[in-house]
């Protein structure tokens, strides 16, 4: 079995393991080793021949070589701005655009730009209506794989994101982030008109309609319009006669939860008299 006389040569052997030229180098090495044994020579020129080989060509943005497993080393590319390291040059290039603000991939439909081509491809589905990711359970389709993954948790009941304060769980991380503001009191979304602040962006959007007068949700029965979809749905129950909120004390039902709450207070007072 072929052996290496020094640790340096063993290290070189590991570096050459993934190189196409390794086969030719080792063939020559075996020949020299056999020849030295036959002649009884104590000198071995393989070490010098290995040293003469150019084992690696370091790029300016390359860091040190980190060893993942014995004999195999991986080049690491480091961001000169923040020090974050990457195993692929392309990943570093993509990351650096965060610092430079460069967004070379532009949507031909609306002009919006993106740092990564993959993000542009996903965005363009807004314009094309393409939804390639379909739920096997209910058939609903999505433009993003991540959106499908979150949706599937409706069927599985999985809620992997838990609040550390109250242990309430959520299907996605963004909902958890919004929930945390209940505990922190943070309201980062502020109305430019009146200064009122909100914990959710959607709540601010709905609030702004109070100032603009915009009522985008119209009743299909009477064409009455509303600021929110929820209020429109609630109004629709007047036409359908649906009264899903039932008083447990007297059996009277209501179209709105708020109406039931008001009724229950007076109902309780009557029963205690």
Swiss-Prot record:
Residues the record lists as binding Zn(2+) 5: 247, 250, 263, 267
Xref: Pfam families: zf-C2H2, zf-H2C2_2
Zinc finger (CCHC-type): 245-267
Record-listed Zn(2+) 1 binding positions: 79, 82, 95, 99
GO molecular function: DNA-binding transcription factor activity, RNA polymerase II-specific; RNA polymerase II cis-regulatory region sequence-specific DNA binding; sequence-specific double-stranded DNA binding; zinc ion binding
Primary location group: nucleus
Binding locations of Zn(2+) 2: 107, 110, 123, 127
Family the UniProt entry places it in: Belongs to the krueppel C2H2-type zinc-finger protein family.
Protein name as catalogued: Zinc finger protein 32
Species this chain originates from: Homo sapiens (Human)
Phylogenetic classification of the source organism: Eukaryota, Metazoa, Chordata, Craniata, Vertebrata
Gene: ZNF32
